[in-house]
Regions:
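Alpha-helical, largely C-terminal catalytic domains
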Residues: 1-371
Length: 371
């Protein structure tokens, strides 16, 4: 294969069809309503980022059984999560702590953000959280909040790791990266929303069963691996894909000899292993002593498949990643990569701002180019 041209895996061929169907029939209605809201309520710069993310398409593909109201609630949460990323992505760990705590306290109780003047928090409190509460089943709301509390804590942890420059402990080892990514990708709250849309009333003690937790963990692993494969081209152009599984594989001492094509194959093997573990866990699930509950557990496993497949479908067609140059490349899973890392204007701007605001130590910059 030519230089700079890479064969990506056909991950969809490895997976069963979505039990919930291809896409929510309410996609167009939710998409139109959400984009009108974004245009009216959000500032131009942030609105552009939101449009580019194509969140309505992801919501409709990953939650195919969701009603229009539920899709709007899911989009409200996605927007809130996007806001958390903006509040924590380019600031000190101290600021991350403050902003994450403000974000979760607002989500937990809208009065928690009442004194904040930040436009994101105001929008969450007045617009987004009411949408969520109107659609999320009361049974699932406590689980939803608990999953977001864990998510916010891990966003803080990730910031401290980044500030302490502990990459050798957090991002240079495949296993450590996988464990950390499970809690920072933000998928667990989405799974709670999925249980709500499907009316799956699974109590906490059943969710805590070892086979249930492993099944959920490996589903998240599949989402994470797929995201890192399909977003690699974008991240490579933005910042050299500093925090991406394909980069971590290159840094891990056991796999640092692999070139990029071999790393893609290795990531595919990790995906296959996660899928095998998912099926194994599902087959071994015991009865929980109630026919209706057992049916809900089985439907939850179906929902996890919907989510994994829907996320991949979205990754293949969205304009945020732009993984493929044209339709023929998409059909053949061909990625064309500019072999000059760190050449994009986005990355140059990232470096300049990082140095100016003290967010990138000189030693990290040296390693970035010469390690």
């Amino acid at each position: 294969m030519a230089t700079g041209v890479y064969q990506l895996p056909n991950l969809l061929a490895l997976l069963p069809k979505k039990p919930g169907g291809d896409i929510s029939p309410h996609f167009k209605e939710a998409d139109t309503g959400y984009n009108a809201w974004v245009h009216k309520k959000l500032g131009w710069f942030f609105a552009k980022e939101v449009y580019n993310a194509e969140m309505p398409l992801l919501a409709a593909m990953a939650w195919p059984l969701a009603s229009c109201q539920e899709l709007r609630a899911i989009l409200a949460y996605m927007t809130s999560s996007f806001m958390l990323e903006e509040l924590t992505d380019r600031c000190s760990s101290t600021k991350v702590v403050n902003n994450s705590q403000l974000w979760i306290s607002t989500l937990r109780d809208t009065e928690g953000g009442e004194t904040s003047r930040h436009p994101f928090i105001k929008t969450m409190r007045k617009e987004l959280i009411p949408m969520m509460k109107a659609a999320v089943d009361p049974f699932h709301w406590p689980q939803f909040i608990a999953s977001n509390e864990l998510f916010a804590k891990n966003v803080i942890r990730e910031a401290f790791v980044r500030d302490a420059d502990m990459n050798e402990n957090a991002a240079n080892n495949i296993q450590s990266y996988t464990v950390m990514r499970r809690e920072t990708i933000g998928t667990r709250p989405c799974f709670v929303l999925m249980r709500s849309t499907r009316r799956l009333y699974i109590p906490d003690d059943v969710l805590a069963h070892p086979l249930m937790t492993e099944m959920e963990d490996v589903a998240i692993d599949m989402v994470s691996i797929a995201n890192d494969i399909y977003s690699f081209k974008k991240e490579y152009g933005d910042n050299g894909a500093l925090t991406n599984l394909l980069t971590v594989i290159h840094k891990d001492p056991t796999t640092d000899h692999l070139d990029l094509q071999e790393r893609i194959r290795y990531a595919t093997k990790l995906f296959n292993a996660a899928l095998d573990r998912f099926h194994s866990c599902r087959q071994k699930l015991p009865s929980f002593g109630d026919v209706a509950l057992d049916r809900h557990v089985s439907s939850y496993a179906d929902g996890l498949i919907d989510w994994v497949v829907g996320n991949i479908e979205w990754s293949l067609v969205n304009h945020r990643y732009n993984t493929f140059v044209h339709e023929k490349d998409r059909q053949n899973n061909i990625m064309r990569l500019n072999n000059r890392p760190f050449s994009s204007q986005h990355f140059v701007l990232f470096i300049v701002l990082s140095i100016l605001f003290g967010r990138l130590p000189v030693q990290s910059l040296y390693r970035m180019f010469y390690a």
